[in-house]
């Protein structure tokens, strides 16, 4: 069985590193530096990008309160380009980051001068969760970010951490089965519902948007994952030409302790590998290792090891 945890971080390919760093660090409070890597040829991902050299730099940070963290990657070789010219809610793969705030309506009022909100604040009620208030913005490179508040979010700080990542899928039951069976998301936090239908037209590119969604978590720890299927208009598949390092949401990263066991487990279950296990070639990460597989829709999933406590 899968021997790991839930979501550790997400990766975003960026065009303008300084502009994106400023937005996430200074505007959204991701001021806790985890690590950074200089611009160089990272030989361990030649296999992932199927070329050489693979030159990029990156920075990895989080909000002070914790939660899912963010890694920004700026690729130089191979030359990157936007995954899409227009990112929409429902595009297949990693589609959004969901960040908790104390009060969505107040946050919207206070921050609309400095954040590019692309929806009005909305509200619905979800049976397992209760009142759910949300609003969407686009970061400086057009990626969707959701801000949420509800009775489960408490605290005095403006931000409550990135609570979940949103994966848009083509077949929700199939994806639920995959993430539960193979990736350890064994606990259902929110059962499948359609409460967001009709509330996300501003970001879906359509009208009367129909969507069904659920939230899963690994009971051993790590961040949550929202799986959602946009049934009308249908989500657009991952472009065939997209490569790792292109601009946009790149990957969801899970974590655990034993890379060899995980590799053998994924092989036994016939998961498709994008990258076989590699050791990170940077002393900052202390020899941690990682691999990549695909989910049923082709979205990249990274699994990386962390030191045992």
Where are these regions (language model features)?
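Vicinal oxygen chelate
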Residues: 5-15, 55-76, 81-110, 132-138, ...
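Loop-centered beta-sheet repeat module
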Residues: 145-173
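Short hydrophobic beta-strand motif reused across regulatory alpha/beta modules
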Residues: 145-148, 225, 301-304
């Amino acid at each position: 069985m899968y021997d790991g945890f839930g979501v550790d971080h997400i990766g975003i390919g960026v065009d303008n590193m300084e502009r994106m760093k400023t937005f996430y660090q200074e505007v959204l409070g991701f001021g806790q530096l985890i690590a950074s890597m200089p611009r160089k040829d990272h030989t361990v991902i030649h296999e992932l990008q199927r070329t050489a050299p693979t030159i990029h730099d990156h920075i990895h940070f989080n909000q002070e309160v914790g939660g899912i963290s963010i890694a920004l990657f700026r690729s130089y070789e191979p030359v990157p380009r936007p995954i899409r010219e227009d990112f929409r809610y429902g595009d297949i793969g990693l589609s959004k980051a969901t960040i908790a705030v104390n009060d969505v309506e107040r946050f919207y009022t206070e921050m609309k001068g400095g954040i590019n909100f692309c929806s009005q604040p909305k509200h619905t009620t979800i049976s397992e969760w209760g009142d759910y208030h949300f609003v969407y913005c686009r970061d400086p490179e057009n990626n969707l970010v959701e801000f949420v508040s509800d009775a489960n979010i408490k605290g005095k700080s403006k931000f409550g951490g990135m609570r979940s990542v949103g994966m848009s899928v083509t077949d929700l039951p199939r994806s639920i089965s995959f993430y539960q069976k193979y990736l350890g998301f064994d606990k259902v936090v929110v059962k499948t519902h359609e409460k967001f239908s009709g509330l996300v037209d501003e970001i879906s590119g359509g009208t009367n948007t129909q969507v069904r969604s659920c939230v899963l978590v690994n009971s051993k720890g790590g961040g949550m994952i929202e799986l959602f299927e946009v049934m009308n208009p249908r989500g657009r598949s991952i472009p065939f030409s997209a490569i790792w390092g292109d601009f946009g949401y790149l990957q969801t990263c899970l974590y655990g302790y034993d890379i060899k066991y995980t590799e053998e487990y994924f092989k036994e279950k016939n998961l498709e590998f994008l990258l076989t296990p590699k050791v990170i070639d940077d002393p900052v990460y202390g020899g941690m290792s990682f691999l990549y597989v695909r989910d049923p829709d082709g979205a990249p999933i990274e699994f990386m090891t962390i030191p045992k406590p």
